[in-house]
Amino acid sequence: MRGPKKHLKRLAAPSHWMLDKLGGVFAVRPNPGPHKLRESLPLSLFLRNRLKYALNYTEAKKILTQRVVRVDGKVRTCHKFPTGFMDVVAIERTNEYFRMLYDTKGRYVVHRIQAAEADFKLCKVKSVRTVNKGVPVLTTTDGRTIRYPDPHVKVNDTIVFNISTQKITDSVKFEPGNLAYVTGGRNVGRVGIIGHRERLPGASDIIHIKDSAGHSFATRISNVFVIGKGNKALVSLPTGAGIRLSIAEERDKRMAQKH
């Protein structure tokens, strides 16, 4: 039996990390944590490649050892810690707050938020079950286990989780008419209103979604993350508000910026 893999070649790293092919042989391999390797971004890459606060890997590690970076309210000093969708990254020394969100090309964007919005995060409910002595337990997609949740919260619903008190303050049902963010598949990063649910026996359910520009698309239920009641989002959205432009629309936008 072989042990765990400890290295990651740059060519095998997720494409959304946007690493230079000629920048070296290896990439940072994220530690096991709340997010999967292919769906996460290590803290060192966030500081160096996204924020440009460090010129190299060593500088990023030195910033983290000063205990000034918090992820979801907890100080993180490991440069391999995997940050992922909806995580709140706070840098105390500069009083900056960021939420990890996808753009419409599936890449993590540096989305700055206000201090008031940094107090909470949204978590998708992965399972609801009972454990020893009949205690109800809820698990979320970011690895949290919460005891004695609201009995009305079901699988695929979204909870509003207060980071400072570690309590559920609100919940949003997974139902038609609510606003959702797509977190995987070819439509990753798109935002729209949930339409009808297509149930397929023996296969994953298909959810039909329509964005604010009137474009309709469909994706698997596992890729749908509810972020608001009706058409009002509970969190601020990055530039573009999750609307994917066609190739022609992107070209026209670039031409307009040049003139």
UniProtKB/Swiss-Prot annotation:
GO terms for molecular function: RNA binding; rRNA binding; structural constituent of ribosome. The keyword Ribosomal protein applies. GO terms for cellular component: cytosolic small ribosomal subunit. CDD domains: KOW_RPS4 (cd06087). Coiled coil: none annotated. Belongs to the eukaryotic ribosomal protein eS4 family. This is Small ribosomal subunit protein eS4.
